[in-house]
Amino acid sequence: MDGTEIAVSPRSLHSELMCPICLDMLKNTMTTKECLHRFCSDCIVTALRSGNKECPTCRKKLVSKRSLRPDPNFDALISKIYPSREEYEAHQDRVLIRLSRLHNQQALSSSIEEGLRMQAMHRAQRVRRPIPGSDQTTTMSGGEGDPGEGEGDGEDVSSDSAPDSAPGPAPKRPRGGGAGGSSVGTGGGGTGGVGGGAGSEDSGDRGGTLGGGTLGPPSPPGAPSPPEPGGEIELVFRPHPLLVEKGEYCQTRYVKTTGNATVDHLSKYLALRIALERRQQQEAGEPGGPGGGASDTGGPDGGGGEGGGAGGGDGPEEPALPSLEGVSEKQYTIYIAPGGGAFTTLNGSLTLELVNEKFWKVSRPLELCYAPTKDPK
């Protein structure tokens, strides 16, 4: 022994220590007596019992198990190279389990996506087209009803099991509509798309809701598929151009969230955000400002400094600041514009993943509009 070291690549080393049958590292090595090929003991015994009486590598005749002999020297060599054999096998098992679980999740997601797409394609054939020149807004039934039911008074037709049924395409809006064509009616129905049953009664004056299976038109075959389900979704949050005053909520917000977030989550986030911004603006104002104004108008004899101090102490202190305890997702209603200048109310139970799948446009983020709800209750 002259101490010479020979460099061996991991690939060639692994090929020498690999069983040709199971393609894993040799375990309880058995060597054929004639051709000297090595196999795992369990692998070669199973092969011989199955009736294959030949060497799996060179096809030489192997009469029985007597044609094999154990090779403890090779097992000792493997234990020297890989002293932590059990740790290696445990790591390999963990990798296989993770790959199997990931593959199953991807298969489930693709199956659900394909099922939703097929349902949307079938439901598109049941959409009734509105009569030109009429003010009624016609929507598709949520599931069990006949296409001829509920064709009067411009009411939305929605199933009682709207949250459980898969969403369908939205109807086309009549061009010559009056009050019925606006996004929010002049009546007191403020929660249109949030509730399942009561919301459908008040949503007749809205441009269609997504609560009873009235989602937007399905993506045509061959169109680019939306982002991967369960991933992050980027959306643009704009104030409603018709329902929000110019100087009140003129801020466009850019939000990035997960696909399993619902429309109610967005409404609650928006209400909290606006309440916090108002609170910060009022707290950042000059102290005694509101009170000073009240004192100056009430007592003409008081000086500027004293009047301001007295007014700041006697005026309302905390009620002017918005409370965060009463913030609710029903304070704001979320809309989406499918096209043609029409706005559709989004149901609060819908996930952003489902909304993005129906209304996503290529190379553009999802755009939503918000406006204060007239009647939050």
From Swiss-Prot:
Region (Disordered) residue spans: 119-234, 280-325
UniProt feature, compositional bias: Pro residues: 217-229
Region Necessary for interaction with CBX2, residue ranges: 201-377
Modified residues (Phosphothreonine): 186, 191
MF terms in GO: chromatin binding; ubiquitin protein ligase activity; zinc ion binding
Keyword check for Zinc: yes
Residues carrying Phosphoserine: 9, 111, 158, 161, 200, 203, 219, 225
Keywords of this entry: Chromatin regulator, Metal-binding, Nucleus, Phosphoprotein, Repressor, Transcription, Transcription regulation, Transferase, Ubl conjugation pathway, Zinc, Zinc-finger
Biased composition (Gly residues): 176-199, 206-215, 286-314
Gene3D superfamilies reported for this sequence: Phosphatidylinositol 3-kinase Catalytic Subunit, Chain A, domain 1, Zinc/RING finger domain, C3HC4 (zinc finger)
UniProt biased composition (Acidic residues): 146-158
Catalytic reactions of this protein: S-ubiquitinyl-[E2 ubiquitin-conjugating enzyme]-L-cysteine + [acceptor protein]-L-lysine = [E2 ubiquitin-conjugating enzyme]-L-cysteine + N(6)-ubiquitinyl-[acceptor protein]-L-lysine
Keyword presence, Ribonucleoprotein: no
Role this protein plays: Constitutes one of the E3 ubiquitin-protein ligases that mediate monoubiquitination of 'Lys-119' of histone H2A, thereby playing a central role in histone code and gene regulation. H2A 'Lys-119' ubiquitination gives a specific tag for epigenetic transcriptional repression and participates in X chromosome inactivation of female mammals. Essential component of a Polycomb group (PcG) multiprotein PRC1-like complex, a complex class required to maintain the transcriptionally repressive state of many genes, including Hox genes, throughout development.
Listed PANTHER family: E3 UBIQUITIN-PROTEIN LIGASE RING1, E3 UBIQUITIN-PROTEIN LIGASE RING1 / RING 2 FAMILY MEMBER
Full protein name: E3 ubiquitin-protein ligase RING1
